[in-house]
UniProtKB/Swiss-Prot annotation:
Pfam families found in the cross-reference section: Eapp_C (PF10238)
Name assigned to this protein: E2F-associated phosphoprotein
Location(s) in or outside the cell: Cytoplasm; Nucleus
Region spans: Disordered: 1-30, 48-96, 118-144
Function: May play an important role in the fine-tuning of both major E2F1 activities, the regulation of the cell-cycle and the induction of apoptosis. Promotes S-phase entry, and inhibits p14(ARP) expression.
Keywords from the named record: Acetylation, Cytoplasm, Nucleus, Phosphoprotein
Quaternary structure annotation from Swiss-Prot or TrEMBL: Interacts with E2F1. The C-terminal half binds the N-terminal of E2F1. Also interacts with E2F2 and E2F3, but not E2F4.
Phosphothreonine: residues carrying this PTM: T37
Acidic residues bias: start-end ranges: 15-30, 55-67
Lineage: Eukaryota, Metazoa, Chordata, Craniata, Vertebrata
Tissue spec. comment: Ubiquitously expressed. Highest levels in heart, placenta, skeletal muscle and pancreas. Lower levels in brain, lung and kidney. In the brain, expressed in all regions with high levels in the cerebellum and cerebral cortex. Expressed in COS1 and transformed skin fibroblasts.
């Protein structure tokens, strides 16, 4: 009986595996075609027909896909750019204000050195300075002038100055103050006269944003305000003294005046249609 050698290993298998077949000989290729997996057969057929491995073919495929993607993106960008220029200049549906620029005189300099530099670069294209819009400035420079013109027109209308006269013949009437509501700052009067004795009181005939409460009546005795007339009583006759005494007993009637925005009482209204303001904020002009 033959004896096995000492270095014999019954588990050693020297055959090539199915996953990584040795494709160096024709027998291995036949074995792959007969017993290999579909992936192994596909790789073998591709290599035999094209002479290229799987990795090289995949690189070529990726290059083709990338080139196709680039061409597609370029085509789409060209279409978008053509649509943008066509909509802005062709149909003109979206109307935009024309861009305004400053005059060159605003940027002229009196310096001789700068004038020489300007002469050197005179042939170059002049740089235009764009005038920013009110939206870009977040400010309207002409708003104050328009508001002042409106106030002046209101004051002229109060005094019967018509628009047919020129501005030189229409001086703006003087006003002691512009009256505002102390609670909500609403403008109440643009043309008023200040009281001679009480500096915080004003009277006016033309008001705005004011409502008169005719249902409520305020009574005030006039005799207290006419004490100074008693100095001249000795110079008058008895008939005049009796008439004055009857007049002093008459009460003056007023109606309260409220702000239309917040209903704050700001003035009183007398029988002569004159407003007497006592609870206001005055902007002295």
């Amino acid at each position: 009986m033959n004896r096995l050698p000492d270095d014999y290993d019954p588990y050693a298998v020297e055959e090539p595996s199915d996953e990584e077949p040795a494709l160096s000989s024709s027998e291995d290729e036949v074995d792959v075609l007969l017993h290999g997996t579909p992936d192994q057969k596909r790789k073998l057929i591709r290599e035999c027909l094209t002479g290229e491995s799987e990795s090289s073919s995949e690189d070529e495929f990726e290059k083709e896909m990338e080139a196709e993607l680039n061409s597609t993106m370029k085509t789409m960008e060209d279409k978008l750019s053509s649509l943008g220029t066509g909509s802005s200049s062709g149909n003109g549906k979206v109307a935009t204000a024309p861009t305004r620029y400053y005059d060159d005189i605003y940027f002229d300099s009196d310096s001789e050195d700068e004038d020489r530099a300007v002469q050197v670069t005179k042939k170059k294209k002049k740089k235009q300075h764009k005038i920013p819009t009110n939206d870009e400035l977040l400010y309207d420079p002409e708003k104050d002038n328009r508001d002042q013109a409106w106030v002046d027109a209101q004051r002229r209308g109060y005094h019967g100055l018509g628009p047919q006269r020129s501005r030189q013949q229409q001086p703006v009437p003087n006003s002691d103050a512009v009256l505002n509501c102390p609670a909500c700052m609403t403008t109440l009067c643009l043309d008023c006269q200040r009281h001679e004795s009480y500096k915080t009181q004003y009277r006016a005939m033309f008001v705005m944003n004011c409502s008169i409460n005719k249902e409520e009546v305020l009574r005030y005795k006039a005799s207290e305000n006419r004490k100074k007339r008693r100095v001249h009583k000795k110079m008058r006759s008895n008939r005049e003294d009796a008439a004055e005494k009857a007049e002093t007993d008459v009460e003056e009637i007023y109606h309260p005046v409220m702000c239309t925005e917040c209903s704050t009482e700001v003035a009183v209204y007398d029988k002569d249609e004159v407003f007497h303001f006592f609870n206001v904020l005055a902007s002295h002009s």
